[in-house]
């Protein structure tokens, strides 16, 4: 298939232009260790999975495209590394099979509610699935968002998503199919800052008048 890209006019040329080689993964690994960051990646085949083994990662991820490949996800589960399983483009049966494989292998996992369109329209996000998946499988459920703004990811966290995954970019106008579904720096800062404040914003189940409300009540309720 012919296509125009900064790296050439074929799919293969674009793939080669975008993919990291081993040296670049080594740099990611080195930098992440220096910054005390636990990095990980999504393998899309067994060879790539074996390549990632050398880094002794503590987490791994199954992309939405791979959730129906039972042979592959069995290989992932056998590694006994905590795995984030994206559920885009899948039906309940697909998710059920993946969960069964991981539980049979006694491999811990987090389901990631996701909708695989780029960017995803707000009307298609269906964030209620975060609650439904958590109730059905009694496991942690996160959110892998592809919308253009930070708001829905904040709502996902408020619904109890245990983790948030987002694509990030320096500039959404840059070339690439994922750019329009990514957050720029300011959007990422808003997302992170607000999610960290959520426990304070949501609060607790306390009811009654706050002490700091009393002076206002005295001022406004003249009949007291």
Regions found by a protein language model. Give the residues of each.
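Catalytic cores and adjacent flexible loops of soluble metabolic enzymes
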Residues: 1-224
